[in-house]
């Protein structure tokens, strides 16, 4: 006679084994109808699963995050049902849940087309309207093999082979279609109405380019149609903000097949890049960093000593010369240790903060490349702090404050901080891990802001802090990191002379704020939709004459603004002023200065903003003051 304890502490007793659905029905008809699954003693189970003993139970509905994941997973199975009806020779592979959606990998004789995707979506809607129950059957291993052998599902059989210890598996039946899964899944297709297929792509079996190519069908699913509509609106807005599209519109950069994953920066984009670099250079100088520069191509001997050659070689570009093997550096850390190792270091020299705008190259798979967000050639705002163990907490606390200030300057204030702690496979004593994790946790606490643990997510040699930015569309971008590392100094024989004259290994703190310049600029483009704050805009002001009579004064204003350190251009074309204003508004120039006869006579400029606000006529000196204030605010609001 199980006693079920609910989240509010109330209890219900039953005189027989009872399903989650039955418990929900005993509470109320509305809850029974909304029940997607249950969480029994903390474990997710299907609504049809039985509880035989005393247990705690949470009813899972579409309002719960777990409920939403179950809906998405079940939608992936629904893709399988529709595909097998439309394309009977297709072989189903896997259909997992991903962030805000799902996908299904499918082996088929030809690539799917957008027309195929529309047909699959239509068939899914028709199947949902049938309002059928999804039936779960725990099935003996041998029978599972028979089921998929009879259906010719070769990939499912391979997946069964991957689970030699599983003697019974969950089969989920969507009418005549059957799929294998740990579950749970929705009890009925009525939960799947708020879905949409979003895109097609290629994939490889087990993610390995050496294996068979598959078709991947992506989709999204939500608790209701209102949430789906909001998501679609957000995605449409994201498409409008696509950095590749805006990059072309604003003439910022381009990419081409002859240099995959390498950016061709145009003058406008390079201006933005240089503003970022000079800003970060100043920030680092103010915070006690020494800027260095290290080689791009380094003998494999160093990479062998650092461990990268054995663990990272497939991601490195290599070359040979005079019977020596070299690698184009994928990261800067080993080279920074070489700088530290030059000359004798004392405890008085620590902390030593070495920074580099380090150009790195990584041989990313071509299918993973994405605009300037995922590239092969990139520059990091990289730095390494060499310090004593006792200095870690202060260095970490200072870095956290610095990082948050930088993000505010770029207009990001919604920051999540996470501390990744010791993984199962690790090196170093428990005492060392305790001290390292405590130092980073104490530094996070000093910030006064909320943060969370990520248990087991640290590197094998040390814990790390991650900074994740949320942009205007609610998307998360992991950017900054602070990685505790006692391992690389050991491998590369870094040491300093302690106060007692003994040789001691320093702790090495790997840190970055932006991550890579390329990706961060891509983020900024999409966050601002190309409408950069004045300090980042490639052109901050454009001066336009109405007729040729104002040319000399327009050029004089341009020279004055550029001489004051701003980025100004004049547009002296023989075009109507309205045409010029529209064009530069579309180019998202922050300030549009119009000069007519009256402005020449009064030695003023008529100032408009790209948003269409008319600020009136003012002396050039007054506009310089206005622009100075706008630039000095950077990406912060006036109230900050």
Curated annotation (Swiss-Prot):
It catalyses: tRNA(Thr) + L-threonine + ATP = L-threonyl-tRNA(Thr) + AMP + diphosphate + H(+). It is found in: Cytoplasm. Its cofactor is Zn(2+). One of its GO terms (cellular component) is cytosol. One of its GO terms (molecular function) is metal ion binding. Its EC number is 6.1.1.3. The keyword ATP-binding applies. It is an enzyme of class 6 (ligase). Zn(2+) binds at residues 333, 384, 510. Homodimer. NCBIfam families: thrS. PANTHER family: THREONINE--TRNA LIGASE, CHLOROPLASTIC_MITOCHONDRIAL 2 (PTHR11451:SF44), THREONINE-TRNA LIGASE (PTHR11451). Catalyzes the attachment of threonine to tRNA(Thr) in a two-step reaction: L-threonine is first activated by ATP to form Thr-AMP and then transferred to the acceptor end of tRNA(Thr). Also edits incorrectly charged L-seryl-tRNA(Thr). This is Threonine--tRNA ligase. It comes from Pseudomonas putida (strain ATCC 700007 / DSM 6899 / JCM 31910 / BCRC 17059 / LMG 24140 / F1).
């Amino acid at each position: 006679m199980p006693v079920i304890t609910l989240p509010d502490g109330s209890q219900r007793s039953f005189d027989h084994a009872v399903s989650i659905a039955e418990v929900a029905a005993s509470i109320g008809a509305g809850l029974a109808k909304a029940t997607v699954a249950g969480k029994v003693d903390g474990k997710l189970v299907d609504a049809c699963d039985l509880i035989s003993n005393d247990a705690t139970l949470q009813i899972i509905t579409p309002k719960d995050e777990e409920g939403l994941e179950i809906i998405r997973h079940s939608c992936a199975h629904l893709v399988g049902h529709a595909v097998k009806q439309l394309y009977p020779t297709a072989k189903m592979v896997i259909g997992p849940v991903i962030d805000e959606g799902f996908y299904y990998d499918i082996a088929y004789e030809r690539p799917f087309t957008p027309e195929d995707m529309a047909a699959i979506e239509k068939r899914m809607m028709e199947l949902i309207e049938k309002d059928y129950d999804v039936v779960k059957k725990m099935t003996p291993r041998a029978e599972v093999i028979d089921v998929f052998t009879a259906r010719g599902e070769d990939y499912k059989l391979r997946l069964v082979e991957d689970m030699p210890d599983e003697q019974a598996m969950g089969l989920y039946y969507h009418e005549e279609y059957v799929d294998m899964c740990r579950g749970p899944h929705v009890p009925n297709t009525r939960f799947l109405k708020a879905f949409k297929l979003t895109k097609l792509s290629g994939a490889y079996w087990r993610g390995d380019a050496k294996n068979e190519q598959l078709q991947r069908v992506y989709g999204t699913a939500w608790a209701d149609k209102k949430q789906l509509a909001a998501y679609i609106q957000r995605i449409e807005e994201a498409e409008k903000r696509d950095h590749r599209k805006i990059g072309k519109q604003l003439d910022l950069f381009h990419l081409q097949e002859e240099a995959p994953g390498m950016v061709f920066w145009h003058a406008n984009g390079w201006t933005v890049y240089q503003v970022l670099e000079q800003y970060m250079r100043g920030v680092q100088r103010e915070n006690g960093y020494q800027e260095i520069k290290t080689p791009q191509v380094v003998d494999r001997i160093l990479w062998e000593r650092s461990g990268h050659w054995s663990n990272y070689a497939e991601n490195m570009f290599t070359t040979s010369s005079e019977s020596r093997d070299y690698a184009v550096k994928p990261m800067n850390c080993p080279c920074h240790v070489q700088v530290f190792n030059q000359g004798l270091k004392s405890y008085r020299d620590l902390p030593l903060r070495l920074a580099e705008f380090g150009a790195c190259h990584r041989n990313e798979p071509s299918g993973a490349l994405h605009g300037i967000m995922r590239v092969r050639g990139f520059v990091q705002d990289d730095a390494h702090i060499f310090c004593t163990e006792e200095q870690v907490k202060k260095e970490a606390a200072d870095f956290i404050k610095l990082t948050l200030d930088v993000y505010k300057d770029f207009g990001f204030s919604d920051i999540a901080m996470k501390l990744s702690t010791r993984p199962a496979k690790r090196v170093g004593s428990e005492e060392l891990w305790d001290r390292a994790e405590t130092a980073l946790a104490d530094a996070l606490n000093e910030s006064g802001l909320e943060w969370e643990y990520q248990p087991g997510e640290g590197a094998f040699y040390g814990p790390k802090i991650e900074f994740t930015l949320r942009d205007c569309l609610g998307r998360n971008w992991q950017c900054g990191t602070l990685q505790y590392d006692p391992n690389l100094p050991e491998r590369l024989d870094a040491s300093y002379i302690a106060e007692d004259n003994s040789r001691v290994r320093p702790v090495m703190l790997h840190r970055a704020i932006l991550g890579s310049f390329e990706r961060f600029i891509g983020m900024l483009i999409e966050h601002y939709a190309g409408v950069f704050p004045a300090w980042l805009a490639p052109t901050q002001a454009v001066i336009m004459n109405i007729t040729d009579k104002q040319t000399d004064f327009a050029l004089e204003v341009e020279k004055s603004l550029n001489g004051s350190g701003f980025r100004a251009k004049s547009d002296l074309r023989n075009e109507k002023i309205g045409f010029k204003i529209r064009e530069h508004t579309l180019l998202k120039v922050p300030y549009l200065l119009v000069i007519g006869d009256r402005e020449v006579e009064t030695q003023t400029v008529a100032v408009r903003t790209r948003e269409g606000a008319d600020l009136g006529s003012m002396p050039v000196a007054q506009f310089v003051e206005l622009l100075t204030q706008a630039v000095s605010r950077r990406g912060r609001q006036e109230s900050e």
